[in-house]
């Protein structure tokens, strides 16, 4: 606790890290960050997995950036490109900004308004909930090519994020086992004056 009875930032970070991240032992006597931290591929992969794919919440954008129906904004969660969109029902959804077919980037603009998201590569089309709605040449051309007979569009939507709205700040997580945003932030939520809007 710091002056005023609240929790200080350092205390919050210690609690958050101890609750949500694996222990990393620091060598005794080391007072500088080793250069290896910035160039080690294995460490970078671990960081991506723990900080961005693990049970953590990451800031995505402001709700004010997508005020209208069909508005979208693009950002990244770690190295993963994501889309945050307001669907026709007014709900806010988040999903990976890569086509499930061949991994091509879907939205190349940082912001916009659209009713659907189309892949420029093979024209697979998604709605603003991340559902696959159309596959061009699903049956092939003149009996050649196409998708297998048992192909179901409903099973090939974009990878989604859980979304939390705290006073217009939109956070997302890929992890289904992540705690609620309130549990994740703990006492820091009150210290920041954040309440849950959705």
Descriptions of predicted regions:
Residues 71-120:
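Glycine-rich active-site/cofactor-binding loop and its immediate structural neighborhood
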Residues 13-91, 125-198:
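Rieske [2Fe-2S] iron-sulfur-binding subdomain
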Residues 4-5:
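Glycine-biased, low-complexity coil/linker segments
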């Amino acid at each position: 606790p710091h002056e005023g009875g609240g929790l200080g930032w350092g205390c919050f970070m210690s609690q958050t890290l101890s609750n949500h991240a694996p222990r990393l032992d620091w060598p005794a006597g080391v007072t500088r960050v080793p250069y290896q931290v910035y160039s080690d591929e294995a460490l970078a992969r671990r960081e991506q997995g723990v900080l961005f794919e693990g049970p953590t919440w990451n800031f995505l954008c402001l709700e004010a950036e997508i005020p209208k129906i069909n508005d979208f904004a693009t950002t990244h969660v770690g190295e993963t490109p994501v889309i945050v969109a307001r669907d026709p029902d007014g709900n806010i959804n988040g999903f990976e900004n890569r086509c499930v077919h061949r991994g091509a980037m879907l939205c190349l603009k940082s912001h916009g308004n659209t009713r659907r998201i189309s892949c420029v590569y093979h024209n697979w089309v998604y709605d603003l909930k991340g559902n696959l709605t159309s596959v061009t040449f699903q049956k092939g051309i003149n009996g050649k090519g196409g998708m297998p007979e048992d192909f179901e569009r409903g099973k090939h939507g974009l990878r989604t994020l859980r979304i939390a709205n705290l006073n217009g700040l939109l956070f997302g997580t890929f992890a289904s086992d992540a705690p609620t945003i309130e549990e994740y932030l703990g006492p820091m939520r009150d210290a920041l004056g954040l309440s849950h809007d959705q």
